[in-house]
Design a protein with these regions (language model features):
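Short glycine-rich anion-binding loops that position phosphate/pyrophosphate groups of nucleotides
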Residues: 146-148
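Primarily NTPase-proximal linker/entry elements flanking Walker-type ATP/GTP-binding cores
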Residues: 1-91, 98-118, 126-133, 140-143
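Conserved catalytic-core segment of NTP-binding enzymes
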Residues: 101, 121-135, 150-250
Length: 250
């Protein structure tokens, strides 16, 4: 679908255009660049402004499939926005060791963590984290959630409940850049379930070309905020569409 859109735009840009001898490759490349940038066209999301202007804690909820890198992304956000006194909500009460993993991140980062027991209601964990942040004057709550899959209807229904009860200010879909064509289905599944607001692509350092960004942005027409480019807390890079397109054209 993304490729078809790019081809259509490319035809539109080239049909009827005079192409000088020896300039064909350059002209096609320029037209392709424009077509890909058009596919990734997105509204700028002012996350910093949203946090500052919210009357109370700004709630960001992280969603995604198992293994996409949600928990690490939560930690990276806590590091990046530490000046807002973030509180982490251990909303994944399903996966073994998920709470301990977040506890370790919170300890290293020097931020607070709100947790319940395994099997507890995720919606209640997030609710308590927001309440705790408000009482402490924290400006930001970062909520981890259990990894979903196509087949697990119960977990998807639970996610809808967590969103419905807590009304997050921002729902971020965390996607693995190495996913391949399955990225279409993941984008649609989550967007149809909870109306995703933005995207973070992980493992972008492993697959540097950036085709996943092109597919994700086009599939659900939502902005890509950051790329995960390593395992360190600071390895969260602001998304740059022009840079991605240049990588794809190399």
């Amino acid at each position: 679908e993304t490729a078809e859109q790019i081809c259509d735009d490319l035809k539109e840009n080239l049909i009827g255009k005079d192409i000088s001898r020896g300039k064909a490759e350059e002209t096609i490349k320029d037209a392709l660049r424009l077509a890909m940038l058009d596919v990734m066209k997105q509204e700028k999301l002012d996350l910093e402004g949203g946090i500052k202007n919210k009357n109370g804690p700004y709630l960001i909820m992280f969603l995604g499939f198992n293994g996409a890198g949600k928990t690490t992304t939560v930690a990276k956000f806590a590091h990046r926005y530490k000046r807002h006194a973030p509180v982490i909500a251990a909303g994944d009460t399903f996966r073994a060791a998920s709470i301990e993993q977040l506890e370790e991140h919170a300890r290293r980062l020097g931020v607070e963590l709100v947790k319940h027991k395994y099997g507890a209601d995720s919606a209640a964990v997030v609710f308590d984290a927001v309440k705790h942040a408000a009482a402490k004057g924290g400006r930001l709550v970062l909520a981890d959630t259990a990894g979903r899959s196509h087949s697990n209807v119960n977990l998807m229904d639970e996610l809808k409940k967590v969103v419905r009860i807590n009304e997050p200010d921002l729902k971020i879909l965390v996607l693995d850049s190495l996913t391949g064509n399955d990225i279409y289905d993941q984008c649609r599944l989550f967007n149809e379930a909870v109306d995703v607001d933005a995207i973070v692509l992980t493992k972008a350092d492993v697959y540097e070309k950036g085709g996943a960004a092109l597919s994700a942005a086009h599939t659900i027409k939502k902005p890509v905020l950051f790329l995960g480019v390593g395992q360190r807390y600071g390895d969260l890079k602001e998304f740059n569409a022009e840079e991605i397109v240049e990588n794809l054209l190399k």
